[in-house]
């Protein structure tokens, strides 16, 4: 079959002085960073949905891209053509992983039986493509939010028959992910929330969602899937309020239903923006709670109240994110999935490469800067100094539960405590970070 991207062989690393827009300037897969290949640190993935499924339509306009596989025709044949182009893209871009929703790769069909049969055929196609290319599946998931049946949610739907349909999709998608060697399975509750409390039973919906997640965990163990289950937090859109608002909210939910040891988090940069947080905050929070799993690397727009899903281009922001990830030991089963799309006006097919190349260079440069911060150790040293009092006898007695509130009140009076505030030196530390960014 003729190549779709016929004007490009493969994207290659050419160094920072290259002016070739279809070459990497900073991402060198084989470059060693802290003793590990850059490719192994970053674990890049391209997503099926934004890259090959979105046709450029938005709230105010029809599709603008005119991709060959988005034309009228036999649904399975078009899905196979889309898979051909997708794996050509993955190969030429040098991404080791990809991600999908079930209906990204397979036609949904007119019935549950058609859905299952279509998906089974496409899983065989994908398995063959993976074997030919060496590209692996980072994670799979089920789209339980687009079809009108999910207008009031999937697991939180007031109709148990809708709940059951969603369960079928998740079973099918998880088993497909398992068959394809996927390293994670993602649960994003696109409509697991509410539009108004006037018709919503919050307690009931939380119980439904909790039971659904428990069943997902049960099925994972039943089929022997060894990958990581991931929830992807998002505060709103398409619903007004979603139950997986942010990392801290999801932690509380998991604790409520006894799932905190079974499920981790897939953190998306743009979702952090919508929740009123920095990307850095959400990553650091997930790590602090022991829930860090994977990343959807993109960016939002603080001036817009929706999920713009732009490609990451801020080295400053992502250097701090990669610093937190490296300090925590790096990715295990997770990676950096580009949940990002070209703009509607970017209608040239090679714009898909420009977006991903820039994003991969951004994250590669961020990784190298983060590695410098790790090797220098100055930030860690400053934080250790700031909290050093907790290593004292008093600090350790408090943390080990050896002193009560009344004991502390007595201690403070007996020792005539008069602590003096120590400077946080925020400005100096910001200058230090700029030194790593611009002077190293």
From Swiss-Prot:
Gene Ontology MF: a single term: magnesium ion binding
Subcellular locations according to the entry: Cytoplasm
Protein name per the record: Xylose isomerase
Cofactor: Mg(2+)
Residue numbers annotated as active site: 101, 104
One GO cellular component term: cytoplasm
Reaction catalyzed: alpha-D-xylose = alpha-D-xylulofuranose
Cofactor binding note: Binds 2 magnesium ions per subunit.
UniProt enzyme class: isomerase
Residues given in the record as Mg(2+) 2 binding sites: 268, 271, 307, 309
GO biological process, one term: D-xylose metabolic process
Keyword Magnesium among UniProt keywords: yes
Entry similarity comment: Belongs to the xylose isomerase family.
Superkingdom assignment: Bacteria
Presence of keyword Disulfide bond: no
Residues at which Mg(2+) 1 binds: 232, 268, 296, 339
Listed EC numbers: 5.3.1.5
Record's keyword terms, sorted: Carbohydrate metabolism, Cytoplasm, Isomerase, Magnesium, Metal-binding, Xylose metabolism
InterPro entries tied to this protein: Xyl_isomerase-like_sf, Xylose_isom_bac, Xylose_isomerase
SUBUNIT field: Homotetramer.
């Amino acid at each position: 079959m003729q190549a779709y991207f016929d004007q490009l062989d493969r994207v290659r690393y050419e160094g920072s002085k290259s002016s070739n827009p279809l070459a990497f300037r900073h991402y060198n897969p084989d470059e060693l960073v802290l003793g590990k290949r850059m490719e192994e640190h970053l674990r890049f993935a391209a997503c099926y949905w934004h890259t090959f499924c979105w046709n450029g339509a938005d709230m105010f306009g029809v599709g603008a891209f005119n991709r060959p596989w988005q034309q009228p025709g036999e649904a399975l044949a078009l899905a196979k053509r889309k898979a051909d182009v997708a794996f050509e893209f993955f190969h030429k871009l040098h991404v080791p992983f990809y991600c999908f929703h079930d209906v990204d790769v397979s036609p949904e069909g007119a019935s549950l039986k058609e859905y299952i049969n279509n998906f089974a055929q496409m899983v065989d196609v994908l398995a063959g493509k993976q074997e030919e290319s060496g590209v692996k599946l980072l994670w799979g998931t089920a789209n339980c939010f687009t079809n009108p049946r999910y207008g009031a949610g999937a697991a939180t739907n007031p109709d148990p028959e809708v709940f059951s349909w969603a369960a079928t999709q998740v079973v099918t998608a998880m088993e497909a992910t398992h068959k394809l060697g996927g390293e994670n399975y993602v649960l994003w509750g696109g409509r697991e929330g509410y539009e108004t409390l006037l018709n919503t039973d919050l307690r009931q919906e939380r119980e439904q969602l909790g039971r659904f997640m428990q069943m997902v965990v049960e099925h994972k163990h039943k089929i022997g899937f060894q990958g990581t289950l991931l929830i992807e937090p998002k505060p709103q859109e398409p619903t007004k309020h979603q139950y997986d608002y942010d990392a801290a909210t999801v932690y509380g939910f998991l604790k409520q239903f006894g799932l905190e040891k079974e499920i981790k988090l897939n953190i998306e940069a743009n979702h952090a923006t919508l929740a009123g947080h920095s990307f850095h905050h959400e990553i650091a929070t997930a790590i602090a709670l022991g829930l860090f799993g994977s990343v959807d690397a993109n960016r939002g727009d603080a001036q817009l109240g929706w999920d713009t899903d732009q490609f990451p281009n801020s080295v400053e922001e992502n250097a701090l994110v990669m610093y937190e990830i490296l300090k925590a030991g790096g990715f295990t089963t997770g990676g950096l999935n580009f949940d990002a799309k070209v703009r509607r006006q970017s209608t040239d097919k090679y714009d898909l490469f420009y977006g991903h190349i820039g994003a991969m260079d951004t994250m590669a440069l961020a990784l190298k800067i983060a590695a410098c911060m790790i090797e220098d150790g100055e930030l860690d040293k400053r934080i250790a100094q700031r909290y050093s009092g907790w290593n004292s006898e008093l600090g350790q007695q408090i943390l080990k539960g050896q002193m009560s509130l009344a004991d502390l009140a007595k201690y403070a009076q007996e020792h005539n405590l008069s602590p003096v505030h120590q400077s946080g030196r925020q400005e100096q530390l910001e200058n230090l970070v700029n030194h790593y960014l611009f002077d190293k």
